[in-house]
Amino acid sequence: MSAIREKVNISERRACRLVGLSRSVLHYDAKPDHENEVLAARLVELAHERRRFGYRRLHALVEREGTHANHKRIYRLYREAGLAVRRRRKRQGVMIEREQLALPGAPNEVWSIDFVMDALSNGRRVKCLTVVDDFTKEAVDIVVDHGISGLYVARALDRAARFRGYPKAVRTDQGPEFTSRALDQWAYANGVTLKLIQAGKPTQNAYIESFNGKFRDECLNEHWFTTLAHARAVIAAWRQDYNEQRPHSALNYLAPSEFAAKHRATADAPAAFQELV
C-alpha cells in the first residue's frame, strides 16, 4: 500500500478506497496464537532434550503427550524455531545395491547381532555388542567391554534369553567372534540357527546396521566416556529410552516396547477367546 501511495501521491484513505481495502484491515496486527506459542515452546524443549530428533519424531512425542496437531503445523513451527537437525557428514563409499530383508512375523524369530567400536577419553578402545530383535526392533542388549570373545558373545545371548526366550535364528557377519566354536556350540545346544551373511555385504544385515547408525548418532557421538563404567551406565540408559520412549518410523512411530506389547495383546486375544468359548 505504501508503494502505491508513493507512486501516485495520494492519501492512505483514498488508496484503500481505490483497491477496495478497509483501513482497519490494513492496520490489523495479528496477535500470536497462544496455542502455537505453547506448542512451539514444547518443541524447542524436546529438541534440546533430544538433539538428533527431526520433526517427525518430535511430532510423535507431542502426540503421545496428548497434543494433537497436523504434521504440517508441526513442521512449520519446527522450521520457524530453527530446529532443523544438522546432518552429520557421511563418508563417501562405493555404491552398492541394497537387498530387501524378509521381515520376521513374530518376536524372537530372528535376532541380529554386530559390533560397534568406540573409545574412552584416554583412548582405550571400547567394544559394544549390539543385539536387536528384527521384528519388534527392540534392543535386546548392548554389551560393553574392552574385549568380547566368541564365548563372551554366547554368554551374553544366554543372559538375554533368560528374560525373553531363545530366538529361532541369529543373523551375524563372518567376524571371528561369530564364527567361533563357542558360538557354534551355543547355537547347537539351544536349537538356534546361525545365519551368516556373505562377506563384504553388510546390507544383508540391514536391520542391525540401521540400529547401529542410530546408536552411534544419538548416543556414542553425543557423549564423551571417561571410564568403562561411565560408558556402560550411559549406554544402558540410552537403550532403555530407545526401547520404551523413542518413536520408531518402521513401527508407525511407536516405541519398540510399546509395539511388542501391542503385538502380544493381539496374539493372545484369539487364545483368550477360545478359553471363553
From Swiss-Prot:
Recorded GO MF terms: nucleic acid binding
Biological process per Gene Ontology, one example term: DNA integration
Disulfide bridge positions per record: none
Keyword Transport among UniProt keywords: no
InterPro entries according to UniProt: HTH-like_dom, Integrase_cat-core, RNaseH-like_sf, RNaseH_sf, Transpos_IS3
Residue ranges of domain Integrase catalytic in the record: 103-264
Pfam assignment, any one: rve_3
SUPFAM superfamilies the record matches: Ribonuclease H-like
Keywords recorded for this protein, A-Z: Transposable element
Name of this protein: Insertion element IS407 uncharacterized 31.7 kDa protein
Organism this protein belongs to: Burkholderia multivorans (strain ATCC 17616 / 249)
